[in-house]
């Protein structure tokens, strides 16, 4: 199979064509984002902005991946696992978004319901990997390579659930999670290309194409949000790609902003529950910088630069 930009172009085209129609449909139905009460007050003006846009780039990415791999006669079990992870987590997010819109509230699925769904999808991915004779090897720093299917399965479960939620936490500003995801998926596309892993190249390029098309409508001021349907799909996809490239730890650098966003929430909760004091003005940490007076664009650009630096450092040292 030869390298081609067809996955990117086709996914981009599908998103750019159908997203405006989706935005128009959501506006006609008066279906828009419900802004959380505890969020920054200036975000209240975003209330009513169409959401669930992730459905469009998610489907565009999947359609592009499928037709290119079928055309190239390279559709294998790895491709199906990537698609199932991407779609599976996206469906959980879709249900979450749908409940929020239907009941006109900021609470969708309950935490345990969302977690259960994420665990089920992760368990399905692990089962399919077993049937595909995937090498259940995990390199643990200072301990070396560990070949233990049970330990590896627990790690995959944690990785998929953790990073799907990490991207979700980062989706709080116009264009932020979209830009960070483009950087991360582009980095993995390059790694997959270097390793001649064409299935992952096609998948990542398809996702990038959809994201670039989506960014046209999602940058500030956003005409649409991706919703949990998009952010959970992106996080689940990234985690699965890192595992199937046998480079799971790479996501700590390539997805460094997602990691920092998650850590800020964890530290804030621990600090408040143990001392009654908050470390940050508001979490996830992008809101902290907003509270310091940074504009959304400034936060976006600085965070994108941090994400890009993390990816470059990884490629220089281990790429």
UniProtKB/Swiss-Prot annotation:
Q: How does it sit in the membrane?
A: Multi-pass membrane protein
Q: Which cofactor does it need?
A: Mg(2+)
Q: Which family, according to the similarity comment?
A: Belongs to the glycosyltransferase 4 family. MraY subfamily.
The record's keywords, sorted A to Z, are: Cell cycle, Cell division, Cell membrane, Cell shape, Cell wall biogenesis/degradation, Magnesium, Membrane, Metal-binding, Peptidoglycan synthesis, Transferase, Transmembrane, Transmembrane helix
- What residues form the membrane-spanning segments? 5-25, 51-71, 79-99, 116-136, 149-169, 172-192, 197-217, 224-244, 252-272, 299-319
Pfam families this protein is in?
Glycos_transf_4, MraY_sig1
UniProt keyword Lipid metabolism present? no
Enzyme Commission (EC) number: 2.7.8.13
Q: Which InterPro entries match?
A: Glycosyl_transferase_4 (IPR000715), PNAcMuramoyl-5peptid_Trfase (IPR003524), PNAcMuramoyl-5peptid_Trfase_CS (IPR018480)
Protein's name in the database: Phospho-N-acetylmuramoyl-pentapeptide-transferase
Reactions the enzyme catalyzes:
UDP-N-acetyl-alpha-D-muramoyl-L-alanyl-gamma-D-glutamyl-L-lysyl-D-alanyl-D-alanine + di-trans,octa-cis-undecaprenyl phosphate = Mur2Ac(oyl-L-Ala-gamma-D-Glu-L-Lys-D-Ala-D-Ala)-di-trans,octa-cis-undecaprenyl diphosphate + UMP
Keyword Manganese recorded: no
Q: What is its main location?
A: membrane
Identify the metabolic or biological route this protein is part of. Answer: Cell wall biogenesis; peptidoglycan biosynthesis
* MF annotations from Gene Ontology: metal ion binding; phospho-N-acetylmuramoyl-pentapeptide-transferase activity
